[in-house]
Amino acid sequence: MKKLFLFFTLIFTAFAANSGLFDKKQTFLKVDDAFAFSATLSTDKSQLQAHWDIADGYYLYQDKISAELVGKSNPLSLHTQQAAELHQDPYFGEVKVFTHSIDGIFRGTFNNADDKVEITYQGCTEGFCYPPETKVLRIGDLAVSQEQIVEKTVEKNTALLSEQDRLADGLFHSKWTIFGFFLLGLGLAFTPCVLPMLPLLSAIVIGQQQRPNMMRAFSLAFLYVQGMALTYTLLGLAVAAIGLPFQIALQHPYVMIGLSILFVALALSMFGLFTIQLPNSLQNKLNTWSQKQTSGAFGGAFAMGMIAGLVASPCTSAPLSGALLYVAQSGDLFTGAATLYLLALGMGVPLMLITLFGNKILPKSGEWMNTVKQTFGFVMLALPVFLLSRILPEVWEPRLWAGLATVFFIWFALQMSKNGFGYAIKIISFALAMVTVQPLQNWIWQTQTTTQSAVENMPVSQVKFKQIKNTEELDRTLAENPHSIAMLDLYADWCVACKEFEKLTFSDPQVQQQFQNILLLQVNMTKNSPENKALMERFNVMGLPTILFFDQQNNEIQGSRVTGFMDADAFSNWLKALH
């Protein structure tokens, strides 16, 4: 009996063992247990603090974490306190992941309690990968955090942010930052994008037949700057809402040619060939408000300022990019509009001062005034050259400038002779005319040597960029990158600051030394092709120039983006910091 009992005991034990062996199943945590998520708001409601507790053996992908306000297409940028780790993933290869925990900040404006934020993330563990998980959070349901870790996180990451990101971050933290944009505008007033507006303002105020007194001159200059600021503000908001296609549309050859014809007509009117004024019927109705709607009238000054705003609009600078980035991410049009207006007002103040002092210094009566008016006619002719240089082949720009300068010096010498000035001035004027006409002589007679021709046609920066046409080619090229960093330059022929980068920054020896360890890529955005639009939407590009930097995992390096011109020293230091 004992033997039978022992036999059946062994049989049942074996079956139980077999059952346990074949039925054993590896269990994985539920997604909310593997990646416990929580979120709070900062006290000023400008930051959403996200926290993940990650179970041991699990990890979240850095590039799979994203967030956006529901109903708005612009993503919210994430800044984390922890550094991501490199991980060899069986599904995605070498990637950056977070383990243990994440403290992250999404910047935005979260004042509306009914707004919702969508936060998406994805993680894995050995042998199992979770699908993307999305949390929809109502702003009014989030608790307000008093913890200081938020401020420390911001402080740590601010040093890594580009200038435009720091400016946008400043707007998120305090609305008083908008007044700092006025000071930034003062600095922008002396950039190549803003200086072309000076001759137009000077022609309106100083170039009249009857010189205005200081009060009237100030009023004309003030209205001109207000018109410029209004256009700049409205176009800035449109670019933030629509993106680069709007900026490109303003640079269409038809627009550039149309503006050039307008400025040529205004210049010819200053030479006395004809008078620009409204039809008599309409002019009579407006006489009570303004004596004449010529270039010196208040309405004309405001209108010319609005046109001048179009001239400056395509130039992207770090302050402008910061304001546009804030509007795009927050949707706060009021603060964005005020920021853009103060930026434009700062750009206009130096123009007003130069014009007012010029109005006071120059003679106020006599035949000399006709000469002054015609001089500003030549200055105004510089605007079409500036505009057409964006759409014509580069070789035409020096020819146009040479032609304008030659005609001016010949005219100036004749004026000096007519008014009985000394021979020395006439000789100097004719000599300068002979010097400036040389590019035209070379072009007409084709007398340049082979060496000169080679120098003319040599790329200014002498930097070889690999041209990229679409997102697929970009991904393939980044995947084969032999260097630790790749740089993508978004360029357009009409972009003045892009040409400054090429001529002044990329050609610098210390910058070229840094380029030796970087994969250099470039996309020509001039035609705004479907491929250009796809790249623009993928990287949320708001203006040109824009330079992007990528790591070896083909991800854009956070806070590394450059928008607006940067000189050689600053750009070289920027590249060193990225390494």
UniProtKB/Swiss-Prot annotation:
UniProt keyword Phosphoprotein present: no
Cystine crosslinks: C124-C129, C193-C315, C495-C498
Keyword Zinc-finger (UniProt): no
Signal sequence bounds: 1-16
Keywords assigned: Cell inner membrane, Cell membrane, Cytochrome c-type biogenesis, Disulfide bond, Electron transport, Membrane, NAD, Oxidoreductase, Redox-active center, Signal, Transmembrane, Transmembrane helix, Transport
One GO term of the biological process aspect: cytochrome complex assembly
GO cellular component: plasma membrane
Occurrences of domain Thioredoxin (ranges): 449-579
Subcellular location: Cell inner membrane
Record EC number: 1.8.1.8
Catalytic activity annotation: [protein]-dithiol + NAD(+) = [protein]-disulfide + NADH + H(+); [protein]-dithiol + NADP(+) = [protein]-disulfide + NADPH + H(+)
Membrane spanning residue stretches: 178-198, 230-250, 254-274, 296-316, 337-357, 376-396, 397-417, 420-440
Pfam families documented for this protein: DsbD_N (PF11412), DsbD_TM (PF02683), Thioredoxin_2 (PF13098)
Membrane topology value: Multi-pass membrane protein
EC primary class: oxidoreductase
Stored HAMAP family: DbsD
Function summary: Required to facilitate the formation of correct disulfide bonds in some periplasmic proteins and for the assembly of the periplasmic c-type cytochromes. Acts by transferring electrons from cytoplasmic thioredoxin to the periplasm. This transfer involves a cascade of disulfide bond formation and reduction steps.
Similarity comment: Belongs to the thioredoxin family. DsbD subfamily.
Name recorded for this polypeptide: Thiol:disulfide interchange protein DsbD
